[in-house]
Amino acid sequence: MDKKPFKSLVQKQVVTKEGKRLGVVKDITFETRTGELIHLVLKDLTAYTSNLSLERTKEKEALIPYNAVIAIGDFVVVSEEDLA
């Protein structure tokens, strides 16, 4: 993947490779020691997202594992198979 600044991801729509909308990127979590990206934190969740068994924050925002990200462009595209 190309290098992208953090602020270019915030507010991007997250969709599965099948085109199902999941929500909007609110934040990113990372390992402070290594800098490894861990999760995308999503807000404005869709009804479809509610049916997925995703880890949640205390505020009930969905956490998408960063290793599920396939592409970043106009949307953040994730592999639904990698969400479990």
Predicted regions and their residues:
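Peripheral interaction segments used for macromolecular assembly
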Residues: 1-84
